[in-house]
């Protein structure tokens, strides 16, 4: 485990040694804050309108602001993941340092886990920017905490799944641009699968719908944890990292 920790720390340090980590955090914080501001403004406006018109009970902050906002955050990850993972292995291969890793006394699994965990920690740092903004909502409106925590669990699992896919693609090329572009295409495809099967109930449509990352995050966004969603995310993480290990083994033999 010490080797995994050292590789993870090295990977995380490399992110923060360049502008990429700060740019991604700033980009995410800016977009999230802008969407939150507009959602909160609309919520307050509609609340006043309902009071003046003698409407029903109070509007739900969870339903009207937080759930749609975290759903939007799920969409932003499609753009963040390729930028995080495109350099994981591609840069090592381009610079020739991958040979040093492969000939060092560490296993392929330790290398892959260390790099994936480093990417995950950066993703969590980016995600933490949203928690700072949401803290203001909790100070102001007292929303229900449990659905928010479940939604964040879904975001973390979805992020881990997509980062695993990105790591796999990065291990197959030495060009960061190609790695980032292919990763974006793949995660976008997984995101769009549920839309393509919306009006179809056939077996193939059910399979494609199950493979869609949106389908599995929807339950988390509603505050619901289902076993099938956990199995999907953990299976995708395991599968992508396993295939990455096969790619690394091939590189080791060539090295």
Model-derived regions: residue spans:
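Terminal transmembrane helical anchor/hairpin motif
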Residues: 39-63, 179-247, 252-255
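Aromatic- and glycine-rich beta-strand/loop motifs that create alpha-glucan
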Residues: 1-25
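Residue-level recognition of pore/gate-forming positions within transmembrane alpha-helices
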Residues: 28-32, 118-119, 155, 184-188, ...
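Hydrophobic alpha-helical transmembrane segments of multi-pass membrane transport/permease proteins
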Residues: 19-43, 74-80, 187-189
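Hydrophobic/aromatic residues in alpha-helical transmembrane segments
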Residues: 81-85, 133, 164-165, 243-244
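Helix-loop-helix units of permease transmembrane domains in multi-pass membrane transporters
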Residues: 88-118
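Long, hydrophobic alpha-helical segments
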Residues: 65-91, 126
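Secretory targeting signals
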Residues: 32-37, 57-71, 113-174, 225
């Amino acid at each position: 485990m010490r080797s995994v920790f050292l590789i993870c720390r090295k990977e995380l340090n490399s992110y923060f040694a360049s502008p990429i980590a700060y740019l991604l955090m700033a980009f995410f914080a800016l977009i999230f804050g802008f969407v939150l501001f507009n959602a909160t403004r609309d919520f307050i406006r509609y609340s006043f309108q309902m009071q003046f018109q003698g409407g029903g009970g109070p509007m739900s902050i969870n339903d009207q602001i937080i759930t749609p906002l975290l759903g939007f955050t799920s969409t932003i990850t499609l753009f963040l993941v390729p930028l995080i993972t495109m350099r994981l292995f591609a840069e090592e291969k381009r610079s020739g340092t991958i040979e040093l890793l492969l000939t060092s006394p560490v296993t392929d699994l330790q290398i892959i886990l260390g790099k994936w965990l480093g990417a995950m920690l950066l993703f969590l740092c980016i995600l933490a920017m949203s928690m700072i903004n949401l803290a203001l909502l909790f100070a102001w409106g007292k929303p229900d905490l449990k659905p928010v925590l479940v939604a964040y669990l879904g975001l973390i699992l979805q992020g881990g799944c997509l980062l695993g896919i990105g790591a796999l693609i990065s291990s197959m090329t030495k060009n960061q641009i190609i790695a980032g572009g292919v990763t974006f295409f793949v995660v976008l495809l997984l995101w769009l699968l549920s839309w393509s099967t919306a009006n179809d109930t056939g077996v193939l449509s059910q399979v494609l719908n199950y493979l869609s990352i949106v389908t599995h995050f929807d339950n988390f966004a509603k505050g619901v944890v289902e076993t099938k969603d956990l199995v999907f995310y953990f299976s995708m993480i395991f599968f992508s990292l396993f295939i990455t290990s096969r790619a690394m083994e091939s590189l080791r033999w060539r090295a």
